[in-house]
Amino acid sequence: MLKEALVNKLDYDELSNCMRCGFCQPACPTFRETGYEAASPRGRIALMKAVADGVMEPDKDFVDQMNLCLGCRACEPVCPAGVPYGQLIEQTREAIEEVQEHPWWVKAVRKLAFFHLLPHQKRMYQLGGLLRFYQRSGVQKAVRKLGVLSILPKQMREMEAIMPEASGKGIVDFFGGTVIPAVGERKYRAGMFHGCIMDVLFNETNRNTVRLLSEAGCEVIVALDQVCCGALHAHSGEREQARNLARKNVAAFRKADVDIIVSNAGGCGAMLQEYDHLLAEDAEWQEKAKWFASRVKDISEVLALLVEPKEWQSLPQRITYQSSCHLRNGMKVTKEPVSLLQAIPGATFVQLREGDRCCGSAGIYNLVQPEMAGSLLDEKMGQVAATQADMLVTSNPGCLLQMKAGIHRAGLEGKMEAVHIVDLLARVSQK
């Protein structure tokens, strides 16, 4: 059954484009960790092709190797043939998901998260309200004091320790409407993609994004009908649900009639920018998706174009930057975040060795593959500590939580702060 599903889902021409040169191997975190050919992009593509050609039957080892992939796409920029590995691994996971039998509790968690929570923003706000109550009412302190969290896996305990303050309301409630006018002359009509998790766990970052855009001359439009971007769905094999979400977002932002669509999360932005590929076989939505994808920008691209750093406050601290994999490898945004950080008056920018290597967050990878994620994080934190930076900056919520967990794990709390680039820029640009 899996073989037939793979044959139906996989883009065979792209499989054949792999030249087996091996340039992807030094860029691949799982290959570098294990040294196994099967744990490299080249190896995984060879496995996909072998199954599609009928040379081998897909077994548990095949599925395990596909699931071990971070989906960081570090292999794509170094591939001379331009093989879209990210699309191939998502197609493979979609095929696996069609036939795989999960334990009942895994089915329940997946159904709850992917179909009943993430796609429904009102429910996400309700969940945020409950988390906020847990954090502020004294329940969290009591739970920690009584040691209740000891029953949870280590990675869950670490995440609870660094969980940001949740919000039960979104940016529309905060700003009192869906249109935030530009300060001064309007340069762009910018659609703000607020994200499902961002507006609950990183609401302050979203508010800062709106303020920075407005002060940079953007009229900010928050499309009310927008939903989750679908990235976690696509990465987990639920591509049909990702397509459903994509159609809703395309419709919402076309209705808003915006010039650009701004994301402040690398993972979301990369997904949004590839809606044209996701909906390529949908005749009704194909052109609409191209319209949408062509307008998606990361917040750093917009700010690098519009802001005047010499008006910023001085920040006499050492700063280093951990690049978001999907921002770098998916959206191809590399220079703008660094140029903004280097422009902060008084700050010393320190290049992070292998700052382009995945931190191990990779969506929910750190929860489902904790051993590999932990190994990558430990290596990353050794490199971070070597910079002696006061601030570790990133541009994606998952990376930010992973960096906070790494700081906690490495005993660097009080010595180093992990911060989203938007929050740092909002700090230095306050008048």
Label each PLM-derived region with a short phrase.
Residues 11-15, 44, 62, 72, ...:
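Short runs of predominantly hydrophobic/aromatic residues within well-ordered alpha helices
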Residues 1-7, 31-64, 82-112, 413-422:
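Non-heme iron-sulfur electron-transfer modules
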